[in-house]
Curated annotation (Swiss-Prot):
Annotated localization: Cytoplasm
Species name: Clostridium beijerinckii (strain ATCC 51743 / NCIMB 8052)
Entry binding sites for L-aspartate: T120, N124, D125
Residues reported to bind L-citrulline: Y88, S93, N124, R128, S177, S186, E263, Y275
Keyword Phosphoprotein: no
Recorded catalytic activity of this chain's protein: L-citrulline + L-aspartate + ATP = 2-(N(omega)-L-arginino)succinate + AMP + diphosphate + H(+)
A family per Pfam: Arginosuc_syn_C
Lineage of producing organism: Bacteria, Bacillati, Bacillota, Clostridia, Eubacteriales
Protein name (Swiss-Prot/TrEMBL): Argininosuccinate synthase
GO function terms (MF aspect): argininosuccinate synthase activity; ATP binding
Keywords, in A-Z order: Amino-acid biosynthesis, Arginine biosynthesis, ATP-binding, Cytoplasm, Ligase, Nucleotide-binding
Similarity annotation: Belongs to the argininosuccinate synthase family. Type 1 subfamily.
Length: 407
């Protein structure tokens, strides 16, 4: 096995990365520098430094990336309208590139020989982390223990942790695999691995109330957007992190953003997860509805195609690629007129548009009215339909001619 003097580890304090510290020291005899990217996981950071040092790390960096994460990764993805397979709001996907980028920066500053992550060889995150590392340090060796060690399951991990006296907050019965940041909380594993099982929402959910426990009265909110970015809630301007935090509270209280889905992983298999994305779900709905008011037909329809590709790029770990950057430039152009206010009604998991306005609205009451109007001459429709239907008419006549010749 190759020897390294100093390894930088992507560290969360969870089961995987907690046991990797003693494993690295045992197998490589190296110094381990743990790096935790704070992307809004909040209480999960409590006691993290003490745990990392106690487990064998020489130091722990806790890098506050939350503001950059929201401004440079989350909001551009909302503007793009990117949703993976129609359901997944990419909560884990776009958190990995920013953490990977910071890992490289610290590894270079520390003079590290390698970067290590705790991603399973069956998952998407191994690709996302390593794509980020390759984008900024293509020569940097990457250690992925799940691809080389003898540990084969989470039960094996717990056994190893107990043998190495690694403190754990989980037990064998409640060992859901989770990922949390300011955008979402995901749950995988245990009973969720069987699609026939209904999720035990009353036991799983942490950010959101269940539908049954949500208030029996609707909650109304108003969001203000400027160039496709939410800038105010109920008339109060906020920075992006404050706004998302507040929407998470409001959305969670109303059971907004609970998704149970089976998705197609990049590595080829299907997996099932339950996602809580309360604030994000509200933002996507508000932004999409405002675009309906502000974008012309051709731009809106073409942008839907861009959204699909953008989602694939983010999901597949291709954030730092020329194509993703080019698509973002296109999206930015489309957002120049996505400015206005939208009122939303939140009720037991539902989000209903309760009215919106924009100085760039392309909706004209004069043209759209079903009543009497003086701006639209309905007689013009006849000529339009004749030209629009010309290919259909020509084809029909051709088919009629062939039938006659065959008789």
């Amino acid at each position: 096995m190759i020897k390294y003097n100093k390894v930088v580890l992507a560290y969360s304090g969870g089961l995987d990365t907690s046991i990797i510290i003693p494993w690295l020291k045992e197998n490589y005899g190296c110094e381990v520098i743990a790096v935790c990217g704070n992307v809004g996981q909040k209480d999960e950071l409590d006691g993290l430094e003490e745990k990392a040092i106690k487990t064998g790390a020489s130091k722990l960096y806790i890098e506050d990336l939350t503001q950059e994460f929201v401004d440079d990764y989350i909001f551009p993805t909302i503007q793009a309208g990117a949703i993976y397979e129609g359901k997944y709001l990419l909560g884990t996907s776009f958190a990995r590139p920013i953490i990977g980028k910071r890992l490289v920066e610290i590894a270079k500053a520390e003079g590290a020989d390698a970067i290590c992550h705790g991603c399973t060889g069956k998952g998407n995150d191994q690709v996302r982390f390593e794509m980020a590392v390759k984008a900024f340090a293509p020569e940097m060796p990457i250690i992925a223990p799940w691809r080389i060690w003898d540990i084969k399951s989470r039960e094996d991990e717990i056994d190893y942790a107990e043998a190495k006296n690694v403190p754990l907050k989980i037990n064998r019965e409640t060992n859901y695999s989770k990922d949390k940041n300011i955008w979402h909380l995901s749950h995988e594993g245990l009973d969720l691995e069987f699609p026939e099982n209904e999720p035990q929402y009353d036991k799983i959910l942490e950010l959101c109330k269940t539908l049954e426990a949500a208030p029996n009265e609707a909650t109304y909110i108003t969001l203000s957007f400027e160039n496709g970015i939410a800038i105010a809630l109920n008339g109060k301007k906020m920075n992006s992190v404050e706004l998302l935090d507040e929407l998470n509270k409001i959305g969670g209280e109303n059971a907004i953003g609970i998704t149970d889905m089976v998705e197609n992983r990049l590595v080829g298999m299907k997996s099932r997860g339950v996602y809580e994305t309360p604030g994000g779900t509200i933002l996507y709905k508000a932004h999409k509805d405002l675009e309906e008011l502000c974008l012309d037909k051709e731009t809106a329809h073409y942008k839907e195609q861009i959204a699909l590709k953008f989602a694939d790029l983010v999901y597949n770990g291709q954030w730092f690629t020329p194509l993703r950057e080019a698509l973002t430039e296109f999206v930015n152009k489309t957002q120049e007129t996505v400015t206005g206010e939208i009122k939303l009604k939140l009720y037991k998991g539902n989000i209903v548009n309760a009215g919106m306005t924009s100085p760039y609205s392309l909706y004209s009451e004069e043209y759209a009215t079903f009543g009497e109007d003086g701006v639209y001459d309905q007689k013009d429709s006849a000529g339009f339909i004749n030209l629009y239907g010309l290919p259909t008419v020509v084809k029909a006549k051709m088919q009629e001619k062939i039938k006659k010749e065959e008789m």
